[in-house]
Amino acid sequence: MELPVNSFDKKEASTLTVADSAFGSEYKEGLVHQVVNAYLAGGRAGTKAQKTRREVSGGGAKPWRQKGTGRARAGSSRSPLWRSGGVAFAAKPRDFTQKVNRKMYRSAMASILSELIRREQLVVVDSLKLNEPKTRELKESLKKLNLGNVLIIIDGDDRNINLASRNMVGVSVCDALHVDPVSLVAAENIVVTVDAVKRLEERLS
């Protein structure tokens, strides 16, 4: 398939031939949901820990005798029913990692990119270079594309673009080798350079 390559004057400059497997696949909602959830789960620390009644310090002595006080019977002051007691079904550290194999991950990424193209939320530009790390220069370039919140995907690390975008609200920059499914799903619009498209195609092939 062919993608239109835009210049920053919003005119169609040329076209870029890309693989259907990477940018023209069908949208697999179930797979995308699974991969996004697995990615988010992998970012969880899993360090939450609470104490059960046996782990809370104290509570060894019976608070009062079994009968004759008129109060409900109690065997320990560390019961989950009591203030400062243990927690019933206390949370323990655990690993939230979900297994996603490489084929599933690549298929989900291709599915997301293809859907973004169909919805016209992905714009390919010939290049994005800044002479200096100036926010004004980057803002003027993006303004020509008439986009709102945007994720910029570039090939490699561009110091000028990274510095220029740091204090721009709604603008984030990512390298094509490290872009993740959550960033793609969350983005309102995506600007990709031609070099980044080729890198994504290599990555998903």
Swiss-Prot record:
Record region (Disordered): 44-79
GO BP term, example: translation
Keyword Ribosomal protein among record annotations: yes
Keywords for the protein's UniProt record, in alphabetical order: Ribonucleoprotein, Ribosomal protein, RNA-binding, rRNA-binding
GO cellular component assignments: ribonucleoprotein complex; ribosome
Cross-referenced InterPro entries: Ribosomal_uL4 (IPR002136), Ribosomal_uL4-like (IPR013005), Ribosomal_uL4_dom_sf (IPR023574)
Taxonomic superkingdom: Bacteria
Similarity-based family: Belongs to the universal ribosomal protein uL4 family.
Known function: One of the primary rRNA binding proteins, this protein initially binds near the 5'-end of the 23S rRNA. It is important during the early stages of 50S assembly. It makes multiple contacts with different domains of the 23S rRNA in the assembled 50S subunit and ribosome.
Protein's name according to its UniProt entry: Large ribosomal subunit protein uL4
Organism (species): Coxiella burnetii (strain RSA 493 / Nine Mile phase I)
Gene that specifies this protein: rplD
